[in-house]
Amino acid sequence: MTLPTEIFGDVIVVHTPEEVGADQADGLESLLVTLERRNVVVDLDATETIDSKGLNALAESQRNLRELGGDLKLATAVQSNRKILEMTRLDRQFEVFESVIDAVRSFR
């Protein structure tokens, strides 16, 4: 899986696709743990649909990155995405920011 990325110092931002579901979950998880940076921000603003497989891929990626000394944080201003994170209580596991810039700055 290839997704658009941006690098800000030791942080890489990954922009997710419109759908993050079962078809994309394995590829997303593999991508996130093989990046050249260990501090990752996942930008969910373009994502309209995310299911349990997609959420699990994010959670597993965060766990793997933390084992490697990094972290994974989320950025989204989209209310439906924020609601899903709240309903699944993943907003307690992840640091969730309104903007990519705020998420990147949190690593400093």
Provide a role label for each language-model segment.
Residues 1-15:
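Short beta-strand/loop segment at the start of cytosolic alpha/beta domains
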Residues 5, 91-94, 104:
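Generic intrinsically disordered, low-complexity segments enriched for polar/acidic and small residues
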Residues 8, 45, 101:
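Conserved catalytic submotifs in the C-terminal HATPase_c
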Residues 16-20:
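Short, flexible loop segments at the rims of nucleotide/cofactor-binding pockets, characterized by
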Residues 22-94:
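Amphipathic alpha-helical interaction surfaces in cytosolic regulatory modules
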Residues 96-108:
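A charged, well-structured terminal subsegment
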